[in-house]
Amino acid sequence: VWARGQVVVSLKAPNTESIVEYSKTHEKALVDFFVKVEMNRAIEQLQKEYSMVVMDNLKSDLNVMLNAPANFTYYKDTTDFFWSSNNANTGRMDLIVYTFPYTDPNTFTEEYLVAKRDSVLKANLPGSFPGSYMQTETRAGVEYTPITLNGKYCGVMRGLWRMQGDMMGGPFVSHTRLDEKNHRVVVAEGFVYAPETDKRNFMRRIEAALFTLRLPGEFEEPVTETLDIPKEKK
């Protein structure tokens, strides 16, 4: 008997050694599969309950849609830049969406997007102290991975952020898409500040919101993460 919505993977092999070998060979794929299952559950929940503040402002000002968690009620909206947060004392999650013209064929590269991120955040997210601002912590390395969402390219960037001139920092993840109709690049990013606790669940929740980003022409499309099941060992 399984719980509703529970996902079970059965491994069948002629002997224990084969199962161990298969599990070691496909360890990352198996973990990724279950992570994506959890991501789809979070996406499904966000499609049922989400922040109307974020949805309405993004649709009217940037002409995009995104289902942020319902407790994202604090926001700042400027030209081509939107910020929202749950403003929590513990487990703070923030969301930003910004756009810029698509003019450079090297846009979808780690180097370009890190530089663009730093310039945009320096201008739009000042810290609490004079002269402080958010930057990418490049010393820890940044991971850039191209994926396909609903048949279209999306650049996923993961890394750490830090507040220049302050002691704050934490993880971030961003999705970068090309809005072909409007010849612009759209970046949606979530970041977490939770020095007192594990950040994994907060990051997964904010990343689920990024998967709900819809550009003009996609507003009616369903959103899910593609589930890649490891192939059978021959």
Placement of each model-derived feature along the sequence:
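Signature of long, low-cysteine stretches enriched in small and polar/charged residues
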Residues: 1-13, 17, 123-182, 197, ...
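Long, acidic/polar, low-complexity amphipathic helices and coiled-coil-like
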Residues: 1-59
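Extracellular structured ligand-interaction cores
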Residues: 6, 61-63, 69-71, 81, ...
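Active-site-proximal beta-strand/loop segments in catalytic clefts of secreted hydrolases
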Residues: 11-13, 100, 189-192
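Surface-exposed amphipathic alpha-helical segments
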Residues: 21-44, 66, 72, 185-234
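Short glycine-rich, low-complexity/disordered patches
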Residues: 36-53, 123-141, 222-228
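N-terminal "mature-domain start" segment
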Residues: 47-76, 213
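Secretory pathway targeting signatures of secreted, lumenal, and periplasmic proteins
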Residues: 69-128
